């Protein structure tokens, strides 16, 4: 801040949403309106980073800090293991079957820098799909039957809502395990 930096994009985490979901989330898809529920030391640190960002922008009205709550970051080399997730969907229940291709994560950082406004905002950053072939509605019915769905789920859509990032940042995932030959 002393160096005159006015735009900051920080790597936050999906873990603020309650991962590993030993306690059911109250609704799905999860979004930024869901209050932080850190369940690990790592998540507590990410929560404190976001709280610090809120204080910094309060002290400096021209400062822009964006917290990108990245899902589990993957590279194309990781996609070879994804078919095994479909054989055992419970193995990825811990983060609602979410992921983010590292290249799309980079796109989100660029979009956040380009669209920065004074203040602090958070965005869930995930791919548009899940890591398994099982439809998302079926995953929720099987593994989280008591969790309210805020809307009808289609196909393998992500259960970590990226709607705010799409709307405000122009973020749209371009890479993913289904597109990799």
Feature names for model-found ranges:
Residues 1-39:
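Conserved Rossmann-fold NAD(P)-dependent oxidoreductase catalytic core, especially the SDR/UDP-sugar
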Residues 27-35, 59, 73-93, 142-148:
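A short C-terminal helix-loop "cap" of Rossmann-like NAD(P)-dependent dehydrogenase/epimerase domains
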Residues 73-90, 95-122:
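Alpha-helical substrate-binding/gating segment
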Residues 37-65:
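Active-site Tyr-X1-5-Lys
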Residues 12-13, 66-72:
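Conserved SDR Rossmann-fold cofactor-binding beta-strand/turn motif
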Residues 103-181:
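C-terminal substrate-binding subdomain of Rossmann-fold SDR/epimerase-dehydratase oxidoreductases
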Residues 42-49, 77, 84, 162:
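Conserved N-terminal glycine/acidic-rich loop preference
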């Amino acid at each position: 801040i002393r160096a005159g930096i006015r735009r900051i994009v920080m790597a936050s985490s999906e873990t603020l949403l309650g991962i590993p979901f030993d306690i059911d989330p109250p609704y799905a898809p999860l979004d930024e309106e869901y209050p932080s529920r850190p369940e690990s030391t790592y998540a507590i640190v990410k929560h404190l980073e976001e709280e610090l960002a809120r204080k910094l922008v309060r002290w400096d009205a021209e400062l822009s800090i964006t917290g990108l709550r990245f899902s589990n970051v993957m590279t194309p080399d990781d996609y070879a293991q994804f078919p095994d997730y479909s054989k055992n969907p419970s193995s990825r229940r811990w983060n609602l079957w979410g992921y983010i291709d590292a290249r799309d994560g980079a796109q989100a950082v660029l979009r956040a820098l380009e669209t920065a406004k004074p203040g602090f905002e958070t965005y869930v950053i995930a791919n548009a799909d899940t890591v398994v072939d099982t439809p998302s509605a079926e995953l929720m019915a099987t593994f989280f039957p008591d969790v309210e769905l805020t809307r009808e789920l289609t196909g393998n859509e992500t259960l970590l809502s990226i709607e705010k990032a799409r709307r405000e940042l122009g973020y749209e995932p371009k890479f993913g395990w289904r597109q990799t030959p």
